[in-house]
């Protein structure tokens, strides 16, 4: 089955499917699923020797303000394979701006059917402070050595803001 056929979720915006592009703690390689073929491409080798602190992916059939599907960070006990689809629930959003404009990153935890480990996390403020600091630090610096690129982290927002972003981006994609 092509990744293009993966639905956005079971019950938006509370129950979503995230297509993983980059595993947690992986080498500094940015992968992206091509939105036309469904194939996993190497987007670039990151100049900064850093690794993603969480699994990184997107929600299919959504369109964020940067013109791409909504980005999602998924903390898990083990790194996930690129191309894997994981059922999640959103708990927050990291608000960011980069050289292309707004670039929010949702944070979602594995659905309770996959792991009870995250049941107590209802909102971004329930995440470990160290994890939030690692995520913030990563996104503040991962483009530091790329000429003409920059990132400004604008702060964290709650689960309701994440759900609102999912609904808005799903509606945006449906209109396109």
Swiss-Prot record:
Cofactor: Mg(2+)
Catalysed reactions listed for this entry: diphosphate + H2O = 2 phosphate + H(+)
Ligand binding (Mg(2+) 2): 71
The UniProt record lists the keyword Cytoplasm: yes
InterPro entries: Pyrophosphatase, Pyrophosphatase_sf
Keyword Transport listed: no
Enzyme class: hydrolase
Keywords: Cytoplasm, Hydrolase, Magnesium, Metal-binding
SUPFAM superfamilies: Inorganic pyrophosphatase
PROSITE patterns reported in the protein's UniProt record: PPASE
Subcellular location field: Cytoplasm
Gene Ontology molecular function terms on file: inorganic diphosphate phosphatase activity; magnesium ion binding
UniProt-annotated binding residues for Mg(2+) 1: 66, 71, 103
EC number(s) from the headed UniProt entry: 3.6.1.1
Purpose: Catalyzes the hydrolysis of inorganic pyrophosphate (PPi) forming two phosphate ions.
Record-linked PANTHER family: INORGANIC PYROPHOSPHATASE
NCBIfam families given in the database record: PRK01250.1
Subunit structure: Homohexamer.
Family to which the UniProt record says this protein belongs: Belongs to the PPase family.
Protein's name in the database: Inorganic pyrophosphatase
Species whose genome carries this gene: Salmonella typhimurium (strain LT2 / SGSC1412 / ATCC 700720)
